[in-house]
A protein has these predicted regions:
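Short, flexible loop segments at boundaries between secondary-structure elements
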Residues: 136-152
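Active-site-proximal alpha/beta segments of enzymes that process anionic O-linked groups
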Residues: 1-138
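A generic fold-level signal
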Residues: 14, 104, 152-153, 177
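Active-site-proximal segments of metal-dependent phosphoesterases and phosphodiesterases across multiple
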Residues: 130, 147-164
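Metal-dependent active-site segment of extracytoplasmic phospho-/sulfohydrolases and closely related
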Residues: 157-188
């Protein structure tokens, strides 16, 4: 079953702020980035409660959220098949996921930190097979391109993100023995 939470807003416009806020016990109005480093976050609490926790990162770091839990930096350790210049396509997060799930022996939380639709280099966020909306803006200098091309390029990132999330759901469906769930949240 898929549930769409409609009344959800990001807590900030940059990953460096919004990600720690999302995992904090504090509401946005009381959240302070400096204080967040002095307190436990949701992952810390889950780990202390006995869950295995693993952060798999394809977006340049957890911004301190995963500093006390096991962490895999896929931008350094990712399968070269998914390499795109100096980054990786988000499908790298699915590579090996099925094998990880086969080896789960207790309650587990896996965080798949995606690159998603980060701009302004939207054109670098999806493989050519997902270039469905055209013409596209194939540059980080988006101010030099028509709005239609920027929107098309962004829409291609959404199409690809949907593909990756769908892939994760398909992998989870292979494990009916688990009471599994997938929560997709954009940090900004």
């Amino acid at each position: 079953d898929i549930v769409n939470f409609r009344n959800v807003t990001a807590s900030g416009t940059a990953t460096a702020f919004s990600l720690p806020c999302m995992f904090s016990h504090l509401p946005r109005a009381r959240f302070n980035i400096d204080d967040s480093y002095q307190s436990e976050n949701l992952l810390d609490v889950m780990q202390k409660a006995g869950y295995d926790v693993l952060w798999m990162d394809n977006d340049g770091g957890s911004k301190g959220v995963a500093r006390r839990v096991p962490y895999i930096d896929l931008m350094k350790e990712g399968n070269p098949e998914f390499r795109n210049g100096d980054t990786f396509f988000d499908e790298v997060l699915l590579d090996g996921l099925e094998d990880r799930l086969k080896n789960i022996s207790k309650d587990t939380v896996l965080v798949l930190h995606m690159m998603g639709s980060h701009g302004p280099s939207y054109y670098k966020r999806y493989p050519d097979a997902f270039r469905k909306f055209a013409p596209t803006c194939d540059s980080a200098e988006i101010q030099n391109f028509p709005t239609e091309e920027i929107v098309n390029t962004y829409d291609n990132t959404i199409l690809y993100t949907d593909h990756v999330v769908s892939g994760a759901i398909d992998i989870l469906k292979k494990f009916p023995q688990y009471e599994a769930g997938l929560l997709f949240v954009s940090d900004h």
